Amino acid sequence: MSLLKMEYNLYAELKKMTCGQPLSLFNEDGDFVEVEPGSSFKFLIPKGFYASPSVKTSLVFETLTTTDNKITSINPTNAPKLYPLQRKVVSEVVSNMRKMIESKRPLYITLHLACGFGKTITTCYLMATHGRKTVICVPNKMLIHQWKTQVEAVGLEHKISIDGVSSLLKELKTQSPDVLIVVSRHLTNDAFCKYINKHYDLFILDESHTYNLMNNTAVTRFLAYYPPMMCYFLTATPRPSNRIYCNSIINIAKLSDLKKTIYAVDSFFEPYSTDNIRHMIKRLDGPSNKYHIYTEKLLSVDEPRNQLILNTLVEEFKSGTINRILVITKLREHMVFFYKRLLDFFGSEVVFIGDAQNRRTPDMVKSIKELNRFIFVSTLFYSGTGLDIPSLDSLFICSAVINNMQIEQLLGRVCRETELLDRTVYVFPSTSIKEIKYMIGNFVQRIISLSVDKLGFKQKSYRKHQESDPTSVCTTSSREERVLNRIFNSQNR
């Protein structure tokens, strides 16, 4: 730990990483506060900040020669086979770490690798290469399985803990496995933090973008007060301010053969309203809609739009154009709505729900990986990051209000490399609720723009559904005809 006065150059360097957002750190009294320029307080500067050679410092950091927490179960013959780009990442990491050791810098590296790159297997290779006892920290238990699979493939002795940290501490008194796979809430326990700081050298923070380290969280406190000897942040969408805690980044672009298409399924709707909708519209401009809660609630009860989504999905799935579908909503009630309606169409052998409130959901996710055809309905919170179903070939985004980081993570669910190359995303920019019409259009356009500009998708207009089902409740032509007749009649009165 380094308690330092906030001199101008140090403040400027730290503030630059927050991209204009408030800079918050622990002060000498242990309070997590916003740092003001010229402050007389001393602040705890994160160890990982000094990982970059561009940060000037006279501080000298420990190297791996000062510890003896080595893996005992390692077998070099079990090292996973890597693709050329993955081997390039390993080479870059090893080269950077040599330089860090020579200059006595902290061994902290952010692996900024695209969704579908294979961060888990690459990191397991690095873990085996280092041969140091490791803690793998995940934001939720849904990510445990993919780590368990890869750690077992490498042949490392491991322990998984997702529930009580107290019972884990008791077990650690008699055995100390080479690899601990835990959920991040374990870091709220100071005794556990002290234990892993002493007995484990490598700390892997998976999906690091899910943590805002400018907030006083368990992960923030751990990295500040119990900094590990070595640390990897893994992410496809780095959070800029988190660089203060891990200030060395390796980013290798991944070329892909995937054929990625995003369809904007547009339609003309007559205005739709109910008492419930009118009640929620009144809240759109109030403080209760600060995070667009009511915007998404309105979408969840937009019957014509929901019907368009269902019609499109049912027709595409029946035609065999798409086979392994992820349907994403923002709200749980919206998820349940689509699940029930799709269940009526296709039955429980095809339609599954990714419900955070169901403890059996992770087991269900494992089981559907082997299916050739399925529809998985879930929420952005539960399945938007880290969902491990590599075979997904299509994504229906039913919500609209999604930030750029969430968009990139969500689209990454269908960008995993498999033998099948076609990937399709469907977005729905239209709404029958006129008060949010332009807002929804703008939000959905942001999804389209990011997918095209950054992730290599090609945008195409979607007309198949409207042309193939002229009797549908969502048909464009019939609605346009009625409105045009109405306008014509009004002009000739």
From Swiss-Prot:
Short motif DESH box, span: 206-209
Signal peptide: none
Annotated ranges, domain Helicase ATP-binding: 100-256
Keyword ATP-binding: yes
Superkingdom assignment: Viruses
Disulfide bonds: none
Residues where ATP binds: L113, A114, C115, G116, F117, G118, K119, T120
Its job: DNA helicase which seems to act as a postreplicative transcription termination factor. Involved in ATP-dependent release of nascent RNA. Forms a stable complex with single-stranded DNA, and to a lesser extent RNA.
Subunit relationships: Interacts with G2. Might be part of a transcription complex composed at least of G2, A18, and H5.
Family of the protein in this entry: Belongs to the helicase family. Poxviruses subfamily.
UniProt name for this protein: Transcript termination protein A18
